[in-house]
Amino acid sequence: MSTVSSDPAHAKKSRNSRKALKQKNEIVESSPVSDKGKETKSFEKDLMEMQAMLEKMKIEKEKTEDLLKEKDEILRKKEVEQEKLKTELKKLQKMKEFKPNMTFAFSQSLAQTEEEKKGKKKKKDCAETKRPSTPYILWCKDNWNEVKKQNPEADFKETSNILGAKWKGISAEEKKPYEEKYQADKEAYLQVITKEKREREAMKLLDDEQKQKTAMELLDQYLHFVQEAEHDNKKKAKKIKDPLKPKQPISAYLIYANERRAALKGENKSVIEVAKMAGEEWKNLSEEKKAPYDQMAKKNKEIYLQEMEGYKRTKEEEAMSQKKEEEEFMKLHKQEALQLLKKKEKTDNIIKKTKETAKNKKKNENVDPNKPKKPTSSYFLFCKDARKSVLEEHPGINNSTVTAHISLKWMELGEEEKQVYNSKAAELMEAYKKEVEEYNKTKTSS
């Protein structure tokens, strides 16, 4: 009995357990549905990302298309410009050659620079062109060995320090011979170097100015040439005839034709008919009738030859005078260049002096105003006299050209004429020396 009663209970338990299993199975079956939801969400996300990427690609494509269009437009414009240039080049090739009517100093300046470069190498070897040693260095050369004997263990720096200390303790009388030697060496050095250097710098300044002027002149000439070429339009440029040149004499036939032209024109005939009739008449004319016309032509030829001789002489004289003018012009230009350099040197000296005055202000304050001033030189005395005449000869010129003209006049002045100014300068110098002596006496007595 117990076995029977236990079976249904066991069966119920087993059923309950089956139901529980079904519930588990339901839970297991419900999990794939949730996974599908997640998958759809991720797919939508991917789709959105893909759409965004496509939009970006579309925008980039549009941008690249725009860039390509711009590049195509630039290329098209360049092609149009090239075509224009080709046509302009063809026009220029057809045009006559541009020949500037001016002389250029570029080749000359280049040659000068080449010579200067060669000259520099030679000058380096010369002892005269070496910079003079200062009084201190000259003294060091004389006393180096003595200091070395006294201090054999001292190196270069220590030796130079000892010499520097000794130099400071030396009196002015002991320094004087070294200073005098330095001044003499300096004068010799400046005589060798200064003239060439100053002229070179002056010519460089002038060369820069001339380059600017020639560039402007060249531009004006080229613009004028282009206008003429456009105006001519493939026609050959007519030669400019000299109005002063004698005209060639006409032949005996032309003299006869000119006489007959008036009579034949009165018959209401054309120019060609008149020329034909005059030619036939001249052919049929006898030698006796032709003779007076031949004599007239011969006389005209003789007059023409005489006039041509005179014309050639005047042309030669003009060429000679032009050559002289060019030489004078070159001299004047050189003087102008030197004046420019002097101005530059003056400005440099002013800058130096301002620096020196700042240092030596105390010394300058103690300078006596009653001390006699040095007299002007013979050249400056000449300048005072020549300035008026130069301004009268060349009105409206600037100061630099005035000084250039004056310096040229001084250079061309004879020794006798220069002696007048030299003697005046000497008199002024003697008077100055006397004034200095008197000034020194009064200073010592006070």
UniProtKB/Swiss-Prot annotation:
Using the record for this protein, list the coiled-coil segments as residue ranges, or answer none: none
Q: Where is the signal peptide?
A: none
Q: What segments bear the compositional bias annotation Basic and acidic residues? A: 349-371
Asked if DNA-binding is a keyword of the record, the answer is yes
Where can this protein be found?
Answer: Nucleus
Which Gene Ontology MF annotations are present?
Answer: DNA binding; DNA-binding transcription factor activity
Where does the record place the region Disordered?
Answer: 1-43, 110-130, 349-377
The UniProt entry, under InterPro entries, shows: HMG_box_dom, HMG_box_dom_sf, HMGB6/HMGB13
Could you tell me which SUPFAM superfamilies the record lists for this protein? HMG-box (SSF47095)
UniProt similarity note: Belongs to the HMGB family.
The cross-references to Gene3D superfamilies, in alphabetical order and at most eight, read: High mobility group box domain
- DNA-binding region(s) from the entry: 129-197, 246-312, 372-440
Q: Which SMART domains match?
A: HMG (SM00398)
Protein species of origin: Arabidopsis thaliana (Mouse-ear cress)
- A single cellular component GO annotation: nucleus
| Keyword terms, alphabetized | DNA-binding, Nucleus, Repeat
- Bias (Basic residues): 11-22
Q: Which domain of life is it from?
A: Eukaryota
Q: Known PANTHER family for this protein? A: HIGH MOBILITY GROUP B PROTEIN 13 (PTHR46912:SF1)
From the Swiss-Prot or TrEMBL record, give the protein name: High mobility group B protein 13
Protein's UniProt keywords contain Cytoplasm = no
User: Quick one: where is this thing mainly located?
Assistant: nucleus
